[in-house]
Amino acid sequence: MLKCIPLWRCNRHVESVDKRHCSLQAVPEEIYRYSRSLEELLLDANQLRELPKPFFRLLNLRKLGLSDNEIQRLPPEVANFMQLVELDVSRNDIPEIPESIKFCKALEIADFSGNPLSRLPEGFTQLRSLAHLALNDVSLQALPGDVGNLANLVTLELRENLLKSLPSSLSFLVKLEQLDLGGNELEVLPDTLGALPNLRELWLDRNQLSALPPELGNLRRLVCLDVSENRLEELPAELGGLLLLTDLLLSQNLLQRLPDGIGQLKQLSILKVDQNRLCEVTEAIGDCENLSELILTENLLTALPRSLGKLTKLTNLNADRNRLEVLPPEIGGCAALSVLSLRDNRLATLPAELAHTAELHVLDVAGNRLQSLPFALTHLNLKALWLAENQAQPMLRFQTEDDAQTGEKVLTCYLLPQQPPPSLEESGLQSSPSESWSDAPPSRVSVIQFLEVPMCSDDAEGAAAEKRGLQRRATPHPSELKVMKRGVEERRGEAYSWKPESRLPSPLEEDKRLSTESGLSEDSQPSTGTASQGEPEGSLADTQGLSQQEAAPNAQEEAVEEETYEEPTVRFAEDTLLLPPAGEDGESEEGQLEAPWPLPGGRQRLIRKDTPHYKKHFKISKLPQPEAVVALLQGAQPDGEGPAGAGGWHNGPHTPWAPRAEEEDEEDEEEDEEEEEVAVAEEDKEEAVVSAPSIKGVSFDQANNLLIEPARIEEEELTLTIVRQTGGLGISIAGGKGSTPYKGDDEGIFISRVSEEGPAAQAGVRVGDKLLEVNGVALHGAEHHQAVEALRGAGTTVQMRLWRERMVEPENAVTVTPLRPEDDYSPRERRGAGLRLPLLQPEAAGPLRQRHVACLVRSEKGLGFSIAGGKGSTPYRAGDGGIFISRIAEGGAAHRAGTLQVGDRVLSINGVDMTEARHDHAVSLLTAASPTIALLLEREAGGPLPPSPLPHSPPPPVTAPSTVVTASPGESGPLRLAPSLLAATLEGPYPVEEICLPRAGGPLGLSIVGGSDHSSHPFGIQEPGVFISKVLPRGLAARSGLRVGDRILAVNGQDIREATHQEAVSALLRPCLELVLLVRRDPPPPGMRELCIQKAPGEKLGISVRGGAKGHAGNPCDPTDEGIFISKVSPTGAAGRDGRLRVGLRLLEVNQQSLLGLTHGEAVQLLRSVGDTLTVLVCDGFDTSTVAPAEVSPGVIANPFAAGVGRRNSLESVSSIDRELSPEGCGKEKEPPGPTPQWGLEAMVPPGTTGGKMAEGPHSSSCQQPPSPPSPDTLPTNVKQAYRTFAAVPGPHPLQDTPAQPPTPGPMASPEQLSFRERQKYFELEVRMPQAEGPPKRVSLVGADDLRKMQEEEARKLQQKRAQLMREAEDGALSLDLDGEAPDDEEPEEPPPWAGPAAGLSPSSPQPLGGGAPVRTAKAERRHQERLRVQSPELSTPLPDRALSPAERRALEAEKRALWRAARMKSLEQDALRAQMVLSKSQEGRSRRGPLERLAEAPSPAPTPSPTPVEDLGLQTSTSPGRLALSGRKFDYRVFAALPSSRPVCELQSPDFAEELRSLEPSPSPGLQEEDGEVAMVLLGRPSPGTVGPEEVTLCSSRRPVRPGRRGLGPVPS
């Protein structure tokens, strides 16, 4: 493409060439042309193997990039680069650096990393200008002894080498700032290392160092020191001399203590001492006043120093996996602490002073021995509080209790206490192998294992509850947490004692000291005796006390168990179960442990109080006042013995939520093995009538949860007196009448800034106060400058009257705020043994809500919607502080997406929770730089849902309205499958299975395709849906039995057969413990197989592909198919040699990368990036025998309308894999030789010979249909897209002689019936077709950015004209034809040559067939449509109005009239241009006339029988007097180019297309041609047969040269 013009003449002064990632195997030849000017050459990431000798003639190079190639030798000629400053040859195969490198004296930056170097040349140290040297991973065994000669070295990287020692001359590098020696074999550091005065970073990790030299303390400017992964046993005391040190990394060493001198590191910010042997931390650590991160993980610490309280800037403290028994109370002094992790220690209590760390958000105390939590923790705004390894959610709901020992109020929940009594710890720690898992995994792996559970034959009750073959271990499942809670409740009772023989291993093994060899954390070890997994507590002693050698029960006993088996469940009651004294009610003679409640028939149940649903997020945000606790005790303990449910049914007026009992107590709605019951005794309900004392802000729900009323805003008026100082008042104000409101819509005067030390701050003025009066001057309704003047003229003493809003928290309240209140209290579902089908639940009160996800791409004008509400702003709805969509701009991104509606609640923005967010926070997220915004929205079910059409989906089975349950306001899940609907699904032709995927936090290992709004090809072509398109080989989905091609019917009960693609993705990604998929085993696509093709070195793959998403359909049999298909297989490539790939196959995957849903360009890039081995997954595509060859061959399309109006040409989606070409170039590369592209033939063939000519063409195998207006089904709905479509599709050409008739498959018309010009054109076509080499290659002389700016400018002008025309259209002012050539009732006789393409831009006014007058007025359009109806009814289908809305119809009319107006203005402008040109030249040549002028003014040849108006125009133009007067001298084009001219209207949408049309026009007359104000004069001699040579051209267009093979210069009749 670039050889059509001589580049060497255009620009030989090129300074920079970037050829990175171009798959080059040799240096391009054109680079050598720039040897005099080239300074920067980047050839990184190619396949270069050698550097030729001409390469080293680029003497002016200053920057050379050759990294990531296959260069095997660096020639000595590199010395020619005397001016080279930067050299990068990293990641090659260079074995040695030539000695001549020393002549590159200007070299400052050199990177030789990743080469198999073993040494450096001797002269390398002569590069004294070298400042940055990288020698990473080069197998270097020693440094040159004179490396100190590199005196200017600033950065030296020697990582991943084999260095065992360092030369002493290293100390001469006085400018060295960064030294990286990590990953070597250093055992001793030289003392001279401390003599580097400017060293800032020293990396010594992953070496064999056992000690550090004391001289390191002399590095006064050292900022970062990394000595991790060594063998250090102690640190030198001189380390305290590193006064500027900020990062000290000591991980994975053998340190037993830290030196006291560490306290001198005042600037230390990060200290990591994890995986050492520290027994204590020095108290001097408290002197590191800037310490922000302290990592002490995996040591032997038993206590933390008290001086930690001095670290006021500490934000992260991690002391996991130590032996801490107590936490110092001084830790409350860490005011900035936000993350405190104390996992797997031996803590029994937490200090109450921990509540002073106001910024603490994450507290991890899992794996300890805590009995309860201090009540003061309610002061903290915790986001996560971890009490167990398998805790499902970061926050829990707590209840208050009195500590039995201290009498203090504490917080507890179902995860507390964490450990059994101390008497049982040893048995838990020393459990025998028979009690543990036989095949315990080495780390925490989510595995389901089946155990043979031994039982005693004489334990009938245990046998009934011990049918527990399926055991769940090391998975975060709430069932074990509930049983732990049950065990804890039993241990609290004093009436029950344990037999010494009965052993209960601890749930968490505690004495696991992590060493460097083991690396196993305490939470990763399997629990040997976890009282969990749904196993009854009473049977634990017997079950775990038995050895594995005992016999299993026989089959008869198992049958009895199956009959009497009942799921162990957690029962609920309104009363707290009070344990009786010892010996009264629950202890047998043998002292065996029995359940403290009767078996399932009993009424009393285990109470679970303040234990939340595992899906809820709760945080403790407010400490209750003592009065509230008194109210709780009085209202909930009528008997004075313990908390009870007296307030269970008394919901105060301030109850934020009051769900049913079964909703409140719901624990896990996704468990298979539990069936929960709710038993509420009638007497409990009667007792619940007793109400608690009415205390402000306090009420109780069914489970005695302490509830509060929400915080409210109170307003108060203050009067403050301020004494002005020399610096002023120290305040700034904002707002005022006529100014931007400071808060909401309030135009008052507000305090916007208060200086901390100013007099206003000392007087009590705060930011946000509203200023009402200053020294008696009322400021209500005042403008901003008036308030400023009032403050300035107030004198020394200023008396202000302020209005202040303050947030008032309710008194006596414990606020347990759900982070997502809409997820509260889902109705409980019961499950059967087979497929889990939810039962119908009573409808909840309140509006039904549904959620959906919207993903918006930011446009130039933003997102196109507005929000309202949020904290700190006026509520959108009364009493609701959420954020809502308040307005959607018409035509914006949100309006085009169609997924947003006014009134939608915004729950999250890009994953950030917005339920409790401030308005300005939401605005900042929406206005961030991210190009896409993902919104989670909630909408009341009464409103319309986002559109999700199903074009091919069969309707679902009709079910009764009562069989579908819609999500209630508090329920998180959307629609649920009903039994009848599922039963109808099971009657299909393929089996249906239910697959359970445990969610352990990792990926699912599958990809899906399809949905109601997406194509699902090649799956379910007859019945679209959601299908699994890819399964990772060892992923979770593959292990669970899912296969490619499985149809997903439901996800966790949600029917997704009619869901959109995004809804299906959201359902799969919804957080849950277990993902239950209902899949139908549809067969895989026919012919699916995996092929492996090996490419020889340098061999091409040899295939071309077509198709792709958002492009031209690659399947000619299905225009909706967006798959990737093979369109050509070259016999010389690897694919042709293999023989298994053929034309028509569909490509599904390439080297494990899915091609489904990829665009054409993405698929081509993926195929080009494969190496020598190609593993491709294919299936059957389309049958090439049933498709016309023109449709199969790449780059050719038989009918431009066959693939839809929106797709302009198949060239856009056909690419060869073996070379980088533009889509146009790809098409030209693969088209057989021919004179023109297919649409060019259409424009040139005379209308009467369409059928016959096209049958003889090289590309067509059938009769070519002339283009016709598209059907309404294929028209785009967007008006602008319609204009682009019609501009891109070739229309009838204005130079055709006669109106086109409907095509007939008959033979060609006889020559006698043709006019002379038609026979002449036919002769030209026949003569030139075999001689043409192909379509001329074109080079765009206008850059893409310039073209885009020109189009935007034209569109802007067009928009202004459209608005003006809209106004004129309303007044009926468009009745006058502005062209001046003909009145309205007459058609213009001389249309310009460009009028035809311009008219094609309007769908409603296509160009008249046969070259009639152009349509530029409404009357002309009506006449043209009438003529079309008479002549060609099948071609006169207009754009139906019913397909367009009134707004779109008005826009269409305005656009059309604007184009007409532009065409008329263009005609006037060109006439004026011609007149100026003629007048400027007529003065000079009146007396002298050349032979060309006389010949041009001679009478024209005899006209043809029916000349067209265009031909008449040409004849009149050639014979007009004075127009062609030529002087004797050459025509000055610079004068002509300076004349004003504008681009034709037809180039507004597709300039290249219009240009190509002009290049293909046959000449209407053998005289002068005028195009766009360009004069093209030709010699009127008889040409030789063939094409006109360039030597016959005297004057050519100033826009482009006349090239050989151009149409329009035909033989002249005599």
Swiss-Prot record:
SUPFAM superfamilies reported for this sequence: L domain-like, PDZ domain-like
Phosphothreonine modification, residue list: T378, T475, T817, T1304, T1504
Lipid bilayer topology: Peripheral membrane protein
LRR repeats: 11-34, 35-58, 59-81, 83-105, 107-127, 128-150, 151-173, 174-196, 197-219, 221-242, 243-265, 267-288, 289-311, 312-334, 336-357, 359-380, 382-405
Statement: the UniProt record of this protein carries the keyword Repeat: yes
Residue ranges of the region described as Required for interaction with VIM: 719-1184
Post-translational modification: Ubiquitinated; targeted for UBE3A-dependent multiubiquitination and degraded.
Keywords: Cell junction, Cell membrane, Cell projection, Coiled coil, Cytoplasm, Developmental protein, Differentiation, Leucine-rich repeat, Lipoprotein, Membrane, Palmitate, Phosphoprotein, Repeat, Synapse, Ubl conjugation
Region of interest: Interaction with ARHGEF7: 708-1219
Listed InterPro entries: Leu-rich_rpt (IPR001611), Leu-rich_rpt_typical-subtyp (IPR003591), LRR_dom_sf (IPR032675), LRR_R13L4/SHOC2-like (IPR055414), PDZ (IPR001478), PDZ_sf (IPR036034), Synaptic_Scaffolding_LAP-MAGUK (IPR050614)
Subcellular location: Cell membrane; Cell junction; Cell junction, Adherens junction; Cell projection, Lamellipodium
Domain PDZ: 719-806, 853-941, 994-1083, 1090-1178
PROSITE patterns with a match to the protein in the record: LRR, PDZ
Cellular component GO terms, alphabetical: adherens junction; cell junction; cytoplasm; lamellipodium; plasma membrane; postsynapse; presynapse
Biased composition (Basic and acidic residues): 479-494, 1217-1232, 1315-1327, 1345-1357, 1418-1429, 1483-1496
Compositionally biased tracts (Pro residues): 944-959
Positions of region (Sufficient for targeting to adherens junction and to inhibit cell proliferation): 1-809
Top-rank taxon, per record: Eukaryota
Comp. bias intervals (Low complexity): 548-557, 960-969, 1396-1408
Modified residues (Phosphoserine): 37, 699, 755, 826, 866, 930, 1130, 1210, 1213, 1216, 1222, 1260, 1268, 1271, 1310, 1340, 1402, 1405, 1432, 1445, 1467, 1500, 1506, 1520, 1550
Main location (coarse class): membrane
Bias (Acidic residues) ranges: 662-686, 1378-1390
Any coiled-coil regions, as ranges: 664-691, 1341-1368
Its job: Scaffold protein involved in different aspects of polarized cell differentiation regulating epithelial and neuronal morphogenesis and T-cell polarization. Via its interaction with CRTAM, required for the late phase polarization of a subset of CD4+ T-cells, which in turn regulates TCR-mediated proliferation and IFNG and IL22 production. Plays a role in cell directional movement, cell orientation, cell sheet organization and Golgi complex polarization at the cell migration front. Promotes epithelial cell layer barrier function via maintaining cell-cell adhesion.
Stated family: Belongs to the LAP (LRR and PDZ) protein family.
Protein known as: Protein scribble homolog
Gene name of this polypeptide: SCRIB
